[in-house]
């Protein structure tokens, strides 16, 4: 009888340890997604700052890739090719930067979009924010606006259980 009680306690302990291990693996995976997402958004934000003449082209360019279901196709002009880069307009550079960011995100199961930052609907100069989402959190967009309601509220509060990040770009 004592052996059965000891065996039961051991089984409960092993189950608890297994649950902790599963939670640790899940937390590690979430941290990896967040790190990768931040790197992608930071790279795109740096490209936006490096192309001040094309800043107004970025929101539409980024939103053009938000709802894709297959790997994005490259724009006709390769702005990172030294021979072609000198012919790129600021708007073409914005399109190519958006393509590279979404291509990188898509390859690891993420999607990006760009929209007015939450809480700036009445500001005279609206700050632009980049959003990246993964797993079950979806982002949708048209050429003129993005739907980030699965990620965060209009007040800038993350939706409970959402798997996304926001970064202010400019």
Describe the residue ranges of each PLM region.
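Aliphatic-rich helix starts adjacent to a transmembrane/signal segment
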Residues: 1-42
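Flexible, low-complexity segments enriched in proline/glycine/serine and punctuated by aromatic residues
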Residues: 28, 32, 36-170
